[in-house]
Amino acid sequence: MSMKKIIAALLALVLTVSLAACGAAETPTATAAPKEEIKVTEAAVAETEASGTRTVVDALGRTVEIPAEVTRIVAMGNAPRLCSYLQLADKFVTTNQGDLSETVFMAFGWAYRDNWQDLPIAGAGGYGSFNAEAILEADPDVIVCTYEADIVANLEAQTGLPVVSVAQGVLYAEDYEQSLRTLGEVCGVSQRAEEVIAFVNACLEDLDRRTKDISDADKPLILGSAATFRGGHGIQGVYVDHPVFSAVNAKDAAIGLEKQYFDTGVEVDLEKILEWNPEVLFLDAGNLGLVEAEYAENPDFFQQLAAVQNGKVYQWPNSTSSNANLEISLVNTYYAGMVLYPEAFADVDFEAKAEEIFEFFLGRTGYLEVLTEHGVGYDNITLGE
């Protein structure tokens, strides 16, 4: 019997009591230490080689001793999504209830949930709750997560296992890259981490190159609405400082609006939307039913909008399901660019580009078709029909 399983047997009784105290309240995810990379000093290497371990510094600034080789992973919070991008899904020894969701917008879940269906449940998902006994029984080498220090300390205390916390990451930002690099180093897939980072950056450079020299006078005013943050919203829920729009240098009506910490959007008054009068509307397809209900109740409001009058209302898949989907966000960014600046993207086959991105991240083909079959793909729509 492995040492971890011996620990599991010894802790089983006390865990029954301690687990009852574990709440499922929403907790902010880990934030990255300023430009901290994983650090393995020569002294640490020399000291740990004999014991088959190594040390890493995580996003919380903690030095964590982990096995020299990691083959069995428990991933929690947003880490399952990040690990899936790194092709680590087959190393999971547990899953989370939320990652088995049937929603089509959880792209990594669509790709891998069949692989995880029979794994023990380690927790609910992204809120910090966990089942320590199930984790110990699964005998992992390491736990990776996106939790804050108090949850990480509790997780380590109840399992006796090394816990590495990475930043949840802001879409297209440096801390997202850092999280991928940290997970790549911990799990022995640094090359794949660099490939993912290079792929994203190549896409962003391509998008910027195509759009950076377009004058503001030639850009339509746009709004991302029916936004997904803390649940779905109707027309009054708008994305703020949306990285998808920034990546194509769009003229975004909602840029600079004040928002709550960790939120990606806000609710605004109908009068504010009329004041903006966006020429193009992008709506999250998963929340389109809310907008259609609002249209049925108040068609006069919608018919005053230039986007509605000119047939410039578009749906795209929700880029958020619990946390941001990197692959959907990238495809949405290309879609926005092609809608807003068709001449700049005249040489891009959208379906081919979308399939390329989805397959790179998910290791599966056919996801674009799945979105279309569910009625939540990419389309120019008419409200009220």
Predicted regions and their residues:
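N-terminal low-complexity, Pro/Thr/Ser-rich intrinsically disordered segments
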Residues: A33-R62, I66-P67
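Extracytoplasmic substrate-binding proteins
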Residues: T63, V152-G232, F262-G265, Q315-L383
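Bacterial lipoprotein signal-peptidase II cleavage site
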Residues: S18-A32
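Bacterial N-terminal signal peptides that target proteins for export
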Residues: M1-L10
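Alpha-helical, coiled-coil/dimerization segments enriched in small aliphatic residues
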Residues: G237-T264
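A short, structured surface patch at a secondary-structure boundary
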Residues: M76-A138, V142-C145, A253
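Short helix-initiation/N-cap motifs at beta->coil->alpha
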Residues: A59-G61, D118-A132, K259-L270
